Amino acid sequence: MWPLIFTALLPSVILTYEVNIEKLSGLARARVETCGGUQLNRMREVKAFVTQDIPLYHNLVMKHIPGADPELVLLNHYYEELDRIPLSEMTRAEINKLLAELGFYKKGHPEDQVPEEFRFSPAKDSPFESRLSSAAAPETTEPSDSQHTDL
């Protein structure tokens, strides 16, 4: 009897995505790649997520690819792919829970503004900000160095 129960539960255990922090260091944004047609219509939970929930997430976009199975593509600041997560077998609640675990900010309404502390979420900060601030900072000279002694 136990082998039968184990065999029945194995697919659900395999399909659950576990967040690997080391693999996803540098996670900054994501996109959902899926077809827009009949294949998505057969997956009610995923279609509900795509049509109703994606507009609520900051730094999450949708890309239509004809014939593609729905996948969540995790990207870093340079749009380099970190991981792909198949969404076909997941429920809407599981997808939303996964995005929350990954640190994505979900707005209440699509037109709501993103609070400043979540501007870069799921990333903690921007790698470009330190470069911009150091490049924009003018070099200061000591007043004693700028005085002419020959006058």
Curated annotation (Swiss-Prot):
GO CC, sorted alphabetically, is: endoplasmic reticulum lumen
- Family, as annotated: Belongs to the selenoprotein M/F family.
> Per UniProt, what is one GO molecular function of this protein?
oxidoreductase activity
Region Disordered, as annotated, extends over 115-151
Q: Does the keyword Manganese apply?
A: no
Organism of origin: Danio rerio (Zebrafish)
Listed PANTHER family: SELENOPROTEIN F, SELENOPROTEIN M
Q: Does the keyword Signal feature in the UniProt annotation?
A: yes
Quote the protein name from its UniProt record: Selenoprotein M
Record's keyword terms, sorted:
Selenocysteine, Signal
Cross-linked residues, Cysteinyl-selenocysteine (Cys-Sec): 35-38
Which SUPFAM superfamilies does its entry note?
A: Thioredoxin-like
Query: Lineage from the top down?
Result: Eukaryota, Metazoa, Chordata, Craniata, Vertebrata
Which stretch is the leader sequence? 1-16
Q: What does this protein do?
A: May function as a thiol-disulfide oxidoreductase that participates in disulfide bond formation.
Instruction: Please tell me in which tissues this protein is expressed.
Output: During early embryogenesis, abundantly expressed within the notochord and anterior somites. At later stages, accumulates within the axial fin fold, dorsal spinal cord neurons, then in lateral line neuromasts.
Q: Which residues form the active site?
A: 35 (nucleophile), 38 (nucleophile)
